[in-house]
C-alpha cells in the first residue's frame, strides 16, 4: 500500500515552520493516542503514521531528503541514499512533555506513590450586619476527614504496617507498552500509593482517615462583607500517607438588615417623614450603627431628597476611612384622618387653588401637558 505524503498526514503546507509541524503533530497525537482509543486499530495506525511523518519532517536533514526524493529519500528499503528513518533516532521528549505530561501520570496531581495533601474545605458563615461591621468571634462545626488515631493514619491494623506494592515496586507507577512508546500510568493495584495494606485498620477500614465534626473558633475582623473569605490554614481535610492537611475557607454571607442596605463601605436607609415636617421643616432622630443622631430637615423637602451622614458607614476590612450613611427621605401621605384633620386639609387645599408658587414641579408639569395637547 502506497504511503501518504507526510505533509498531508500532518495537515500542513510544504513550507510549514517547525512550530507549525509541532502543533499539527501534537493535535494528531492527542486525538489518536492508543490510550484514548483502546482497541481502535484505525486510531493506532493513524498514531503510527503521524509519528513517522513528524519523525522525518522535524529533522532538517531528513526533511531535505524527503523534499527531494520523497519516501525513497528516507526509506532504505526503497533504495535511495539519504539514510534510513528508523524510529529509534527521533526525540519526542519535548512533545511529550507538553502533550502527555498529565496523560501519562493518570491525570493526578501530587507526588507519585507518596504523601498527598488533604482537600480544602469551604464553610459559609452567616452574619448579621452589626457583626460584620464590628467584628466578632464565632464557633463553627465543620464535617471533615481527620487522621485516624487508631492507626496514626497508616490505614493498617495496629501492630502491622503497610507493605510495598509488588506490582509497582513502591513507586506508584507502572510502565505500559503502547505501540512504539512506553507509557507511565498509575499503578492499578495500589492506586498510586506504592503501598498495600494486607490487614486494614478496623476504625478507618484502611483509609487512614475518619469522618469527624471539628469544632473551630473563627475570629471575624471588622468590616467584612458578603463574599469575603477567611482562611484557616491546615483546618481542611487531613492528608494521606503523612501528607499535610488542606485549608478551610470560611466564606462570609451578611444577612439582609431591617433598616440598612450596604454597598461597600456606605450604608443606605429610607427615612419616612410627615408631609407637615416636609413642608415646614423640622428635626428628627435617625438610627445609625453607633446609636441615634439628629437629622435636620429643611422646609420644602421633597421625597427622594438624600442626606449624607459622614463617617456613619462601615470602616473597610483592609483599612481606610469609614464610609457614609445616606438617608433618603420619603414623604408619607397621611391616612385614617379624623374629621377635624380632614376639615383642616380641605381648608388648606382651598388656599392653594390657582396658586402654583407652592408647587413648582406640579406647575411645570401642567404647563408641559398643555403644550403637549396643544401640539396634538
Swiss-Prot record:
A GO MF annotation of the entry reads:
ATP binding
InterPro entries the UniProt entry points to:
DnaJ, DnaJ_C, DnaJ_domain, DnaJ_domain_CS, HSP40/DnaJ_pept-bd, HSP_DnaJ_Cys-rich_dom, HSP_DnaJ_Cys-rich_dom_sf, J_dom_sf
Per UniProt, subcellular location reads as: Cytoplasm
List the cysteine pairs that form cystine: none
Q: Which UniProt keywords apply?
A: Chaperone, Cytoplasm, DNA replication, Metal-binding, Repeat, Stress response, Zinc, Zinc-finger
The Gene Ontology biological process annotation of the record reads: chaperone cofactor-dependent protein refolding; DNA replication; protein refolding; response to heat
- Where do the CXXCXGXG motif repeat units fall? 148-155, 165-172, 187-194, 201-208
Describe its function: Participates actively in the response to hyperosmotic and heat shock by preventing the aggregation of stress-denatured proteins and by disaggregating proteins, also in an autonomous, DnaK-independent fashion. Unfolded proteins bind initially to DnaJ; upon interaction with the DnaJ-bound protein, DnaK hydrolyzes its bound ATP, resulting in the formation of a stable complex. GrpE releases ADP from DnaK; ATP binding to DnaK triggers the release of the substrate protein, thus completing the reaction cycle.
What family does this belong to?
Answer: Belongs to the DnaJ family.
Subunit text: Homodimer.
Among PANTHER family, the record links this protein to: CHAPERONE PROTEIN DNAJ, DNAJ HOMOLOG 1, MITOCHONDRIAL-RELATED
Q: What is the protein's name according to its record?
A: Chaperone protein DnaJ
Protein's organism = Stutzerimonas stutzeri
Gene for this protein?
dnaJ
Amino acid at each position: 500500500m502506497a504511503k501518504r505524503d507526510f505533509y498531508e498526514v500532518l495537515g500542513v503546507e510544504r513550507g510549514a515552520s517547525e512550530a507549525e509541524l509541532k502543533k499539527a503533530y501534537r493535535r494528531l497525537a492527542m486525538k489518536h493516542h492508543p490510550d484514548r482509543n483502546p482497541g481502535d486499530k484505525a486510531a493506532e495506525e493513524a498514531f503510527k503514521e503521524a509519528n513517522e511523518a513528524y519523525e522525518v519532517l522535524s529533522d532538517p536533514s531528513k526533511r531535505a531528503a524527503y523534499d527531494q526524493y520523497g519516501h525513497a529519500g528516507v526509506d532504505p528499503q526503497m533504495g535511495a541514499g539519504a539514510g534510513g528513518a528508523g524510529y529509534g533516532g527521533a526525540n519526542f521528549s519535548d512533545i511529550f512533555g507538553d502533550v502527555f505530561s498529565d496523560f501519562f501520570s493518570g491525570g493526578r496531581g501530587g507526588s507519585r506513590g507518596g504523601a498527598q495533601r488533604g482537600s480544602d474545605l469551604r464553610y459559609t458563615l452567616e452574619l448579621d450586619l452589626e457583626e460584620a461591621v464590628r467584628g466578632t468571634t464565632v464557633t463553627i462545626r465543620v464535617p471533615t476527614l481527620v487522621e485516624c488515631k487508631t492507626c496514626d493514619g497508616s490505614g493498617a491494623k495496629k501492630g502491622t504496617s503497610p507493605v510495598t506494592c509488588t506490582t509497582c515496586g513502591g513507586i506508584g507507577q507502572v510502565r505500559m507498552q503502547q505501540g512504539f512508546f512506553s507509557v507511565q500510568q498509575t499503578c492499578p493495584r495500589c492506586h498510586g500509593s506504592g503501598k498495600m495494606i494486607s490487614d486494614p485498620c478496623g476504625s478507618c477500614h484502611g483509609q487512614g482517615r475518619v469522618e469527624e465534626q471539628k469544632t473551630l473558633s473563627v475570629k471575624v475582623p471588622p468590616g467584612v462583607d458578603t463574599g469575603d473569605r477567611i482562611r484557616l490554614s491546615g483546618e481542611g481535610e487531613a492528608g494521606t500517607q503523612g501528607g499535610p492537611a488542606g485549608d478551610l475557607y470560611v466564606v462570609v454571607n451578611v444577612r439582609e438588615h431591617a433598616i440598612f442596605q450596604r454597598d461597600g463601605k456606605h450604608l443606605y436607609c429610607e427615612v419616612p417623614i410627615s408631609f407637615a415636617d416636609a413642608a415646614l421643616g423640622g428635626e428628627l432622630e435617625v438610627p445609625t450603627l453607633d446609636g441615634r443622631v439628629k437629622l435636620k430637615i429643611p422646609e420644602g423637602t421633597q421625597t427622594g431628597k438624600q442626606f449624607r451622614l459622614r463617617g456613619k458607614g462601615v470602616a473597610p476590612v483592609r483599612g481606610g476611612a469609614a464610609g457614609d450613611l445616606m438617608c433618603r427621605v420619603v414623604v408619607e401621605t397621611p391616612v385614617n384622618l379624623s374629621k377635624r384633620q380632614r376639615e383642616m386639609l380641605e381648608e388648606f387645599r382651598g388656599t392653594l387653588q390657582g396658586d402654583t408658587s407652592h408647587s413648582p414641579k406640579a406647575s411645570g408639569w401642567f404647563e408641559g401637558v398643555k403644550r403637549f395637547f396643544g401640539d396634538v
